[in-house]
Amino acid sequence: MSFRLILLVLTGLWLGNPAFAMDRWDALSMIESGDNDHAVGPGGEVSRFQIRRELWPGGNPQDAHDALSAAKEIMLPRLDEFQRTHQRPATDFEFYVLWNAPWRVDHPSDAVTKRARRFCNLVRR
């Protein structure tokens, strides 16, 4: 196979998929704060995941590792409860709703629905 053909194939693959999918945690961080570890939300939310102060379990909210650990500590029980009550894992859309409005997971508001769709687009790219 010639170098030119290999280059053409690789270029085609790259152009056909210019963006790569993010995992859920990366997409959540991107949607919530643009990956800004120093972000503070209008309600005092902290970290790249915009966690409410009363839910923050400890650690440095400006440290990406601590923030991810805190987000997982908050979210994993929500995911477990969803799976128990719905008899299936949460979809990407439901994951985002569980993060922002767990009490409305079956009927999210229009604003949360719009953000959940953007979240899904980041995960599925």
Language-model segment annotations:
Residues N36-A39, F82:
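A short, acidic/glycine-rich surface segment
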